[in-house]
Amino acid sequence: MHQAKLNVVNCARSSGYIANELKKRYGIPRLDIDSWGFSYMAEGIRKICAFFGIEDRGEALIADEYAKWKPQLDWYKERLQGTRMAIWTGGPRLWHWTKSVEDDLGIQVVAMSSKFGHEEDFEKVIARGKEGTYYIDDGNELEFFEIIELVKPDVIFTGPRVGELVKKLHIPYVNGHGYHNGPYMSFEGFVNLARDTYNAVHNPLRGLAGIDIRDKGQVQLKEAA
């Protein structure tokens, strides 16, 4: 690690501390990038390639990835346009995700909440988020319920702790950690996210979530219809 020419930091919290220490001890430069979303991933590749003076190779890679994955992304974007999403993740991932899903998928981020966010995370969230978006720091369950009632999201991008909670409200969630169906990084990964968001929002079983199966009359009526 100490022989590297460059440290590329994606998670600005844990790996950032390591990169700062390596810069202090060994003089290795630190470069921060985002790897979620097509626009941010392309920007990150350009930064890395510019550092090493291989811009042409970077542009060729970006062109190949766009040709391979952009048509699939556009298919999902057309069907997710205007979807209302709440993002409840760790501090750094808030500002990684909010603009990428809005710009690359046409999703409207209506609320955000962070765990373990630092001041710099808040500043980036404010800079990237749109005016009128609600932001909660270290929200509890009661605050989550209140904000859900207020903004009425179609889907929530979060972890299992909050995700399993909101399922009781019949609201789908996408596991932001990506270990169910991910990864969500890079061009292919962002298509995975688009796919999972589409499947969550357009799942035909959503309409059945609120039916009380103990009400036999309601079930019979549904079957007759």
Identify the meaning behind each predicted range.
Residues 1-225:
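An N-terminal assembly and electron-transfer interface module characteristic of large anaerobic redox
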